[in-house]
Amino acid sequence: MTPTLAPSSRVQLTDSGKLRHFLTTEHLPRSLLEDILDTAASFVDVGGRAIKKVPLLRGKTVVNLFFESSTRTRSTFELAAQRLSADVLNLDIAKSATSKGETLLDTLRNLEAMAADMFVVRHQDSGAPFFIANEVTPNVAVINAGDGRHAHPTQAMLDMYTIRHYKGGFEGLKVAIVGDILHSRVARSQVHALNILGADEVRLIGPKTLLPVDAEALGATVFTDMAQGLKDVDVVIMLRLQKERMDSALLPSEAEFFRLYGLNNDKLLFAKEDAIVMHPGPINRGVEIASEVADGPRSVILNQVTFGIAVRMAVMSMAISGQDSDMSAAGGAHGQR
């Protein structure tokens, strides 16, 4: 896993402590993470209304900058922005000027000239959203939609929302994160968020070849045995094998991985009877999770997707609000770029 890329609380927060950018869960105050969850709770029912919109970002422009493909994540960000009444621009990186030699910085400057208010950034390189946040003008918010192996903070927060929804809080909870921890930006963000929110214990379970050397330094207990790692946990979060990021030598075979670390009903018996099962998606059935579990009564995977829209609405609205208040405090007029 990648080390901290910047003093993240200073980059992400306004002088008054409001959200300015959302780049990582690391080092953020507990009160802010709880504010995100509380704000998301107010948006959950929007999807069930006849008119699925609130006017909080009316007149704002959100640009999705996805340098790494992800239909699911981009779609939920797009839907979240639309439900906030924002205008949304999806930049096709493969056909954009960046693929023709224009630098990332030049692309940003051109988008800023179009009066963009927010960039949602997904990039294959760790740290790219930090770079963008440091380069944009003060009235543009940046949301990290996943960067390299480093962080995926909105995924972590929708997972935190799901846990709080089903468990009522975090105190006393034992949470197991299972699978390809080494390549998972989601796992890193989850560990930070769980520790900040007061979980009793965070466990990382996987083969030694797929566990980062700094796992315990993150504030997690490491297990290589599923029976020991799942014993009496309240939440099981399964992660997919990121074969596109790994050397084949790290994994004997998918069948062997499933035998040892795939979650089926037999292995789930080691967890508490009321333990919930989560997965950030996409799911590889028969590799990290059996269909009997993914589709079973303890699975809350589909609800994670539903909650994800509300959480991203919360983050986007809070970041824009923080930017606007920061500009007002500085005496600047929003729109001067």
Curated annotation (Swiss-Prot):
What is its quaternary makeup? Heterododecamer (2C3:3R2) of six catalytic PyrB chains organized as two trimers (C3), and six regulatory PyrI chains organized as three dimers (R2).
Q: Name one Pfam family in it.
A: OTCace_N
Annotated residues that bind L-aspartate are located at: K100, R185, R240
Q: Which GO terms describe its cellular component?
A: cytosol
Is-annotated flag, keyword Ion transport? no
Chain residues that bind carbamoyl phosphate: R72, T73, R122, H152, Q155, G281, P282
Query: Belongs to which family?
Result: Belongs to the aspartate/ornithine carbamoyltransferase superfamily. ATCase family.
According to its UniProt entry, this protein's organism is Alcanivorax borkumensis (strain ATCC 700651 / DSM 11573 / NCIMB 13689 / SK2)
Entry function: Catalyzes the condensation of carbamoyl phosphate and aspartate to form carbamoyl aspartate and inorganic phosphate, the committed step in the de novo pyrimidine nucleotide biosynthesis pathway.
Domain of life, per the record?
Bacteria
**InterPro entries, alphabetized:** Asp/Orn_carbamoyltranf_P-bd (IPR006132), Asp/Orn_carbamoylTrfase (IPR006130), Asp/Orn_carbamoylTrfase_sf (IPR036901), Asp_carbamoyltransf (IPR002082), Asp_carbamoyltransf_Asp/Orn-bd (IPR006131)
Q: Which gene encodes it?
A: pyrB
Write down what this protein is called: Aspartate carbamoyltransferase catalytic subunit
Keywords, A to Z? Answer: Pyrimidine biosynthesis, Transferase
